[in-house]
């Protein structure tokens, strides 16, 4: 064979429907995505770094074609973050979950690695592995499950055993379409079921596991019917959020939340407040903790999160230009 002949280019690996693979690698300037692959209905976007953006991190948007997921969809994303790199993961608007949507992706979920026994189930899975001194900020918009949808989400974050990596995970859900006077309907917490599980591992040790389950499936809800049992139980709140934090990059935020928690008193009131929150310290040495929030409106929760994260130094991690786009 002539030495001048070039080796044939490798074709990118074939992905299953809804599968994504990301590898964030270090470079001389900003970290770069040495791998960024996605198959319909998943879409990945990486914007050009802003001038004010610190040099040690990159931004990735995860999107669904059509702005939502339907029954039978499976989205499975795996991410690797190299040493010293930071990744900010965002969305562009709420992730809407439909039971069905005529004309949308009739072939999107015919071939998956693990077919679901329930064709009405919508699934999202994420597995993110961080290397030494790396960090992740996962700050999506809230999930919006619509009437009769069945949604299951599992997210696992694996940090190195040397305890030098950090993650901040925002996981939140809203009540759906809400009041729809034109339809003579209130579509509030009217999904069949919603489940979300988050796990954080440090080496081989699981440090945190948070699970939220909302289940209306046994109550036989009908379109145009009365409020669901879940809606009555969760009233007056239309958004619930969980924030998991761990690692040395988030020491200021951990300390600030602990201070706020120690100096805040939420007394028993005749009427529930517009926003209620709590902070639980999981491991002081690892700077690990969990924030739980209930709010009447998504914007109430967003405002509180933005104020606390800004005061806790998260804005400084991403720069003044990028921060307003994060939360």
Curated annotation (Swiss-Prot):
Subcellular location, in the record's words?
Membrane
- The answer to whether UniProt assigns keyword Transmembrane to this entry is yes
Q: What happens without the gene?
A: Fails to grow on agar media with urea as the sole nitrogen source. Leads to the inactivation of the URE1 urease and reduces the efficacy of brain invasion in mice.
Name it.
Urease accessory protein 4
* Assigned GO CC terms: membrane
Q: Which residues are glycosylated?
A: 120
The entry assigns this protein to a family as follows: Belongs to the UreD family.
Q: What is the lineage of its organism?
A: Eukaryota, Fungi, Dikarya, Basidiomycota, Agaricomycotina
Membrane-traversing stretches: 239-259
Q: Which domain of life is it from?
A: Eukaryota
């Amino acid at each position: 064979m002539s030495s001048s002949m070039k080796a044939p280019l490798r074709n990118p690996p074939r992905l299953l429907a809804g599968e994504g693979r990301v590898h964030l690698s270090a470079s001389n300037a900003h970290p770069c995505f040495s791998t960024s692959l996605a198959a319909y209905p998943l879409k990945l976007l990486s914007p050009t770094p802003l001038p004010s953006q610190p040099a040690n991190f990159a931004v990735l948007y995860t999107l669904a074609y059509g702005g939502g997921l339907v029954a039978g969809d499976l989205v499975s994303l795996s991410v690797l973050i190299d040493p010293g790199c930071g990744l900010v993961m965002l969305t562009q608007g709420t992730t809407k979950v439909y039971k069905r949507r005529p004309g949308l992706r009739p072939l999107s979920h015919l071939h998956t690695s693990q077919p679901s026994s329930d064709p009405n189930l919508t699934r999202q899975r994420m597995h993110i592995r961080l290397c030494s001194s790396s960090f992740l900020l996962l700050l999506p918009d809230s999930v919006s499950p619509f009437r009769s949808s069945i949604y299951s989400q599992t997210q696992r974050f694996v940090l190195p055993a040397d305890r030098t990596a950090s993650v901040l995970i925002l996981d939140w859900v809203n009540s759906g379409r809400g009041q729809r006077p034109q339809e003579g309907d209130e579509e509030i917490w009217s999904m069949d079921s919603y489940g979300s599980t988050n796990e954080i591992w440090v080496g081989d040790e699981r440090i945190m596991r948070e699970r939220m389950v909302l289940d209306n499936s046994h109550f036989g809800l009908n379109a145009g019917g009365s409020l669901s049992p879940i809606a009555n139980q969760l009233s007056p709140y239309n958004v619930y959020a969980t924030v998991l934090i761990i690692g040395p990059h988030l020491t200021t935020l951990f300390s600030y939340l602990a201070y706020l928690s120690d100096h805040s008193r939420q007394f028993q009131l005749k009427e529930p407040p517009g926003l209620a929150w709590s902070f639980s310290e999981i491991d002081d040495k690892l700077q690990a903790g969990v924030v739980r929030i209930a709010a009447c409106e998504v914007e109430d929760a967003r405002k509180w999160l933005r104020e606390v994260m800004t005061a806790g130094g998260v804005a400084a991690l991403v720069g003044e230009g990028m921060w307003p786009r994060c939360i």
